[in-house]
Amino acid sequence: MDRIHLQDGRHIGLSQYGDLEGFPVFFFHGTPGSRVMFLDDDPISKELGIRLISLDRPGFGLSDPQPNRTILDWAKDVQEVADHLDISHFSVIGVSGGGAFAAGCAYQLPDRILSAALVSSTTPFQDGKPPKSMLKENKIAFFLSKRMPWLLKASYRAQKKLIEKKPEKFKKLTKKGNKHLHPSDRQFLQTDEQLELMMRHLYEATRQSVDECIHEPDLLSRSWKFDMKDIQIPVDVWHGKEDQMAPFEEIESIAPNIPNAKTHYIEQAGHFLTDIDDVWRDILLSLKKRAEHQVHI
């Protein structure tokens, strides 16, 4: 099953990893991104008895576009997918841009979601502007999504063409062009296996078009239409202290306002926490344990 048909006629793409009979956890990718998380399977989630359900958001991968969507609209899609899969209760993980959507689901679906993890998560912008401490390259992308979307679209189209036509050149350029990243992040963009996964992930993100790569940054920069302090379910906040893509200082100031949040700040780590096996294991373990406190699984 690669796609689920929704009541409004749209489809949502998904990939499943780990223990398919295990505790269900929905995974929300970054921006841009796709459901493709692993080249094959995830031995860690399988070992922990977790059924990892990775979804494409509208316009990415196999999911149909949803014009004028909001962050909170995603909760309705997730609820319908869970119903289709006959899953009554579950947890959610949102990474980077996906953190906004995990937070929105936690706010909207407290009767269905047992626990949530915000990993390297973006935070609400003030007056629609990215934080001053954000990496310059990321700030430029947000600026272009609002002011010069045609230029950002051309950039993503060029990237897509490179992946399709000259994958080895893409790998070479990626290795050379990541000097702006923290060293702990650069190490995950070095091997052929890592770069192959990145290419598949990004190719799926732009499978239909590059339009959502421009729309979603703009969406994230606008009002989320809910307040993080109104989230009532257990939340784990995971963040690298050296993260500049989603600046650590921002989540550090917001996390104390989330009533049932536990913070896990990783020393000498950047943005790609889910690529660190020990951290990924801890994220899943904590999420499952906090869910078990809510209801017997």
Residue ranges, per PLM feature:
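Conserved HGGG/HGGXW glycine-rich cap/lid loop of the alpha/beta-hydrolase fold
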Residues: R10-L62
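Short beta-to-alpha linker loops that shape the active-site pocket of alpha/beta-hydrolase fold enzymes
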Residues: D56-G61, Q66, T122, A269-G270
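Conserved acidic catalytic loop of the alpha/beta-hydrolase fold
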Residues: D73-S91
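Conserved hydrolase catalytic core segment
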Residues: S88-K132
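Alpha/beta-hydrolase
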Residues: E137, F143-F226
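Short beta-strand/loop motif that positions the catalytic acidic residue
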Residues: I231, V237-H239, D243
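Conserved alpha/beta-hydrolase "acid-adjacent" motif
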Residues: Q244-E250
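Catalytic active-site module of serine/aspartate enzymes centered on a nucleophile-bearing elbow/loop
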Residues: N260-I297
